[in-house]
C-alpha cells in the first residue's frame, strides 16, 4: 500500500465503504507484504533476472527521504486541485488509516514500502529491461495494486505516476535504497499528517 497525503472528509458516504478494524488492516498489510516478497523471491529464483542492489549510502538515503517528502508535497497539491482524486484518496485513506493507532504508522511505512519496492522496482525493472518501458510497466502494475474499486480510479492514476517517479529514481541511482526510503517516508509522513488533521478536526467539533 502506498498512502498519499489527504485531509479526512466526513462526507464519505460511498455505498461500498465498509469500515475495517485495526486488526484487519494490520493483517492485510502483513499478508500483502509477505505475498509480494514471496513473489519477488520466486521470480528471482526461477526467472533470469538479478535484484537491483540495495547499497547503504548516506547520500542515497537522504535522496530517498527528500524524494519521499517531495512526493508527499506533490500529493497534497494534487489533492487540493483535483476533486476526483480528493474523493478517491479520502475513501481509500479513511478505510486504511482511520482504524490504525499512531505506532501502527511505522508498519504503514515499512511493510508496503519495502515489499512493494522490492517487487515493482527491485525485481520488475531489471526483469523487463531496466529502461523506460520497464518503468512504465512496473508503474502500471503498482497502480493496479492500489485499485480498491473501479470508482477509485483517480487514486490508481496518481499511484501509477508516483510509481513512475520511484522507478526513475531507481534507474538514476542504481540503488533500490532510494525508492524504498522514498516510499517508506511518503507513507509514514502522509499517515502522520492524516492523523493530525483527523485529531484537529475532532477537537474543533467539541
State the predicted function of each range:
Residues 19-24, 28, 42-112, 126, ...:
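Juxtamembrane helix-loop-helix connectors linking adjacent transmembrane helices
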Residues 2-39:
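Cytosolic-side membrane-entry/anchor segment at the start of a transmembrane helix
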Residues 34-49, 113-121:
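Membrane-embedded alpha-helical segments in integral membrane proteins
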Residues 31-36, 67-75, 116, 166, ...:
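Alpha-helical transmembrane segments of multipass membrane proteins
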Residues 11-21, 45, 49, 53, ...:
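Juxtamembrane/disordered regions of integral membrane proteins
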Residues 85, 94-206:
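Transmembrane helix-loop-helix hairpins at the membrane interface
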